[in-house]
Amino acid sequence: MHITKVLPVFFQFCTTMMNRIFILLFTLFSFTTAAWTQNLPEPEPPAKDTSSLLHVFRSGTFHGHARFFSMATDNASGLRDYAATAIGGGLRYKTGSFHGFSVGLGGYFIYDLASSDLSKPDPVSNAVNRYEIGLFDIQDVSNKNDINRLEELYLQYQHKSFKATIGKQLPDMPFINQQDGRMRATGIDGLQIHWKPGNSTTLQAGYLWQISPRSTVRWFSIGESIGIYPSGIGPDGKPSNYKNALNSKGVLIASIRQQIHPSLSIQVWNQLVENIFNTAMVQAEFRTPLNKQTTLTGGLQLIRQDAINQGGNADPAKTYFTKGGKSVVYGGSIGLLHRPWDISLNYTRITKDGRYLMPREWGKDPFYTFLQRERNDGYGDVSAIALKASYKLDKLHSKLFLGYGQYYLPDVQNTAFNKYATPSYQQLNLSWKYDFQAFLKGMDIQFLYVHKSVLGNESYAPKYLANKVNMSNYNLIVNYIF
């Protein structure tokens, strides 16, 4: 049997077993760590690559993460509002190195402390909940106390600047990323290689065969992972029908990052989703000191997408990327870094060549104009401008952020370019983060406020407003990382 078929089956078996025992292990570990460390003799000074398997495990590292997340959405007058509060925790363990090899595993569980009935659509617009359900299991709204997932189970080899990791892991790529804006992140299952052959060059390559999107508890093949979230409407104006209808053997990723000059870097990415579409990105960024206190920053970005074969399905009604379709995106950023300020003005343009498409299940937009709680996936002929400013109060261990953007979208009835029937809108994000010190070091508290409203004076039917515009979203998050 081909290795690309054997490995997913093996890791799926491991996932099933680990999901059943992870919560028990987490509980036992929490209550026995103190006693274990008191009763065991002092370990011998660690030695690298010892022949002792016991040493490999004892020299491993544990990391924990507990999170409290409370969210509420205040929709336009007459539309249903929502609120939810979740709590969760997880553990990660990585063994010590044995001739460069190590094993890592980690998992997470979530509980619903209190929430609105997230299964009820708004009675006026018939729109379903969009934000709060993401704290839990988006596929099973009734699941409140059995939300757990094996997130990491991998074998890693590292030698100097070369690292290869195979198995379940967390992503960090422009188009497939953790999008950690709910309780847990998106995970990937595959092979990733990182190599830095020189001081100024970084290479990355990967082959992915499964993805576990944020707000889910299962692992899905690449085709299955597209369409788990609401999928909007097709270019023909009919509801998108590609869920469980796409075929793909996996995702191939390659990138190079080059430091051209101390003040200039360039990165090139190519992401090929077999049988569906290809995405290429070139991004250049610079940082030029103006004086001892001030640095000029900026960047340029170009993205090109093209359909592969029939875009995922030979039936046009069930395909993801229209046969022969393409999209082009370009953007830029210019800013000043003057401690404690970091300010930038950003621009994104999606041309009329076609919809920019990237599964929302896979990650957030890489655009300079991105602000939390909204995406520009699914749109064509878009112009966006955003101002971002952050201010660090080092003595108060705090950081403030302000983001304001205007996003000019096609008409809501222009189905060829407006997949989610969203009006042009303006968005304001305000956030505050505080890092605790001393006894509570490792804990932070964050507050995020988001408001979106229609641009212009045009009136819209409720179905174009609910959970989209003329609404506010409130978030209170507490993290403890140890």
Go through the PLM ranges and name each one.
Residues 52-73, 101-105:
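Transmembrane beta-strand segments of Gram-negative outer membrane beta-barrel proteins
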